[in-house]
């Protein structure tokens, strides 16, 4: 993807030459006169790993580049800064919390090597969360500085297309900005999926968008799903001493080697993670104690069962953020896929997509 963009920006290849130039110029000129829009060689929508890499590469080629990034708060109100999923709600905080779990295991084993450590070892979620969140915020700032150093213009705006060369962005205060560019990259990533068929899922559940930004310990946690995100979260929650259960509909780590998947789940079980296999949740309700009562169906027995938890974490997959309002259009709905945008002609080579 980045290589294709570099080729497009380096020279007037036929493949990347717009085919509706005269019409586009007129549209852009009218919009500019009306709204005083800013123009760029490249506009990147999305400030995650792919978008930032693309923007920096183009800037190194001497192009005038802008990045438009906006984080739609999760249903629980969680939001974050520049850097995308990996920096804010993915790789970085996950690895830090995993490290906290590993340290706990080392401390528990230390007495075998002569260290006299009071047992049981207690973990303070607030202390860990504050350290993780402060580190993430430092990375947010670092990305801002890197863009500034490369003379990449950063806009904290929610983008929607006016036409294939023009984007309208609205900031959190409602102020609109018009941006135009020779090439536009869509790199808006994905957001966790909620099981909307499960009553109470949206009202009472959280996702990986929220777990790393909780101020208080999640307590006894039910993780629904068997993806790597589900097992990673369940693993570090168990590792820091929380009562953790994984509910999975079928097999763990679908798409991965199943012999290795079995070794992973067996290892987790040996360390205290519980698994509910062949189970699907049907509804959640909040009890007077503020705990969550989860009802599920056991496919093996055909019976219903219930359990009480402090937190329910959905980890059942992601949807492309472009399917939501993160990037919207005044024209008919579009999708990302083999045809990048359904509302644009296939012969248009000025729109590109990157990432998930």
Tell where the protein language model's regions lie, with residue ranges.
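The Walker A (P-loop) glycine that initiates the GxxxxGKT/S ATP-binding motif of P-loop NTPases
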Residues: 45-46, 69, 78, 224-225
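Internal nucleotide-binding/catalytic subdomain
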Residues: 246-249, 262, 266-356
């Amino acid at each position: 993807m980045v290589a294709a963009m570099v080729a497009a920006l380096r020279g007037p290849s036929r493949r990347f030459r717009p085919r509706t130039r005269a019409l586009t110029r007129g549209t852009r000129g009218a919009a500019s006169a009306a709204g005083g829009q800013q123009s760029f060689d490249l506009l990147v929508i999305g400030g995650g790993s792919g978008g930032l890499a693309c923007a920096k590469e183009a800037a190194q080629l001497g192009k005038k580049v802008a990045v438009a990034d906006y984080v739609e708060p999760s249903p629980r109100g969680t939001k974050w800064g520049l850097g995308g999923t990996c920096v804010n709600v993915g790789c970085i905080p996950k690895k830090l919390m995993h490290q906290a779990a590993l340290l706990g295991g080392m401390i528990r084993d230390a007495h075998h090597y002569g260290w006299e450590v009071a047992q049981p070892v207690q973990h303070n979620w607030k202390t860990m969360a504050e350290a993780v969140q402060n580190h993430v915020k430092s990375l947010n700032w670092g990305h801002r500085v890197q863009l500034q150093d490369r003379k990449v213009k950063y806009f904290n705006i929610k983008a929607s297309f006016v036409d294939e060369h023009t984007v309208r962005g609205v900031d959190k205060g409602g102020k609109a900005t018009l941006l135009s560019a020779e090439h536009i990259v869509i790199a808006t990533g994905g957001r966790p999926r909620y099981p909307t068929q499960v009553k109470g899922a949206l009202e009472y559940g959280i996702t990986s968008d929220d777990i790393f930004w909780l101020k208080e310990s999640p307590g006894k946690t039910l993780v629904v799903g068997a993806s790597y995100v589900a097992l990673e979260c369940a693993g570090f929650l168990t590792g820091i001493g929380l009562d953790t259960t994984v509910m999975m509909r079928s097999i763990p780590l679908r798409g991965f080697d199943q012999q290795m998947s079995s070794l992973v789940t067996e290892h987790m079980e040996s360390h205290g993670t519980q698994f509910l296999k062949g189970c699907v949740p049907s509804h959640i309700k909040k009890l007077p104690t503020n705990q969550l009562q989860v009802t599920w169906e056991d496919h093996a027995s055909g019976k219903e069962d219930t359990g009480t938890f402090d937190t329910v974490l959905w980890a059942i997959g992601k949807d492309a953020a472009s399917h939501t309002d993160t990037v919207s259009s005044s024209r008919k709905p579009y999708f990302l896929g083999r045809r990048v945008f359904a509302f644009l002609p296939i012969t248009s080579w000025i729109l590109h997509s990157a990432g998930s």
